Amino acid sequence: MTLAYETVSENRSFGGIQGVYRHQSQATGTPMTFAIYLPPDARHGKVPVLWYLSGLTCTHENAMTKAGAQEWAAEYGIAVIFPDTSPRGEGVANDETYDLGQGAGFYVDATEAPWAPHFRMWHYVTHELPELVFNNFPLDREAQGITGHSMGGHGALTIAMTFPERYRSVSAFAPIAHPSESDWGRKQFAAYLGDDKAAWKRHDSTILMREKGYPGEVLIDQGASDQFLDLLKPEALAHAMAERRQPGTFRMQQGYDHSYFFVQSFMADHIRWHAERLG
């Protein structure tokens, strides 16, 4: 695995550095771009890490510029990493619809044509990118949390429940909560994973919550006026958490929709939540 990368940009932000970087990914076989916010504390030693996984159509840039994370990350001394949501470029399979292909990797490793050669976002986010950043930036490998929005919330929850020993905290904003029973999920799983329903289950946070849960507390925020509630299916995850007696908090936020205005509004709560658990 190559650990080389190039700097695209670095900007001062709340006393820290918001950087954008590019590297050649072995997982996807393409160049990949990612962003890291390093708080001022990173000048003095390793800092805890919060992975932020973005939603459909997003790149690394959307949350970096719209989620309002930097101010709170600086205050609580935590780094935030913003990966891209899929491989991109010529020769990479795509689809005319917004919710499949480039910008819609769904945080799975595709096994089906034409997606399998490049769409390995599970491996990229959980193995390749961590190795690169922990070997090149002042980040504490033993203090990792993960969060995300929409498709990224789905990714954060499934990854945390699969690797609970690695991610000491988890939260989500309006996650796609039951993808194997939603049009945001069935279409993508069929395309990327084929008929392997066991693989579908491994990437469904409601099913994972029923079967294994998470050893710590979980924080979920969901806008009650979200225009995609029927696709997100938050009630399925809420019921699974209740049936399991999963420690945590599931908040329906009155009047909030699915936008980054919603994410901004509760970003401070989420970063504080992770900072308290990552120490």
Swiss-Prot record:
Catalytic activity reported: S-formylglutathione + H2O = formate + glutathione + H(+)
UniProt EC number: 3.1.2.12
Lineage, broadest ranks: Bacteria, Pseudomonadati, Pseudomonadota, Alphaproteobacteria, Rhodobacterales
Protein name: S-formylglutathione hydrolase
Annotated PANTHER family: S-FORMYLGLUTATHIONE HYDROLASE
Family named by the database record: Belongs to the esterase D family.
Role this protein plays: Serine hydrolase involved in the detoxification of formaldehyde. Hydrolyzes S-formylglutathione to glutathione and formate.
Keywords: Hydrolase, Serine esterase
Class of this enzyme: hydrolase
One example of a Gene Ontology biological process annotation: formaldehyde catabolic process
Superkingdom, natural source: Bacteria
Gene Ontology molecular function, alphabetical: carboxylic ester hydrolase activity; S-formylglutathione hydrolase activity
A cellular-component GO term for this protein: cytosol
SUPFAM superfamilies, alphabetized: alpha/beta-Hydrolases (SSF53474)
Organism whose genome encodes this protein: Paracoccus denitrificans (strain Pd 1222)
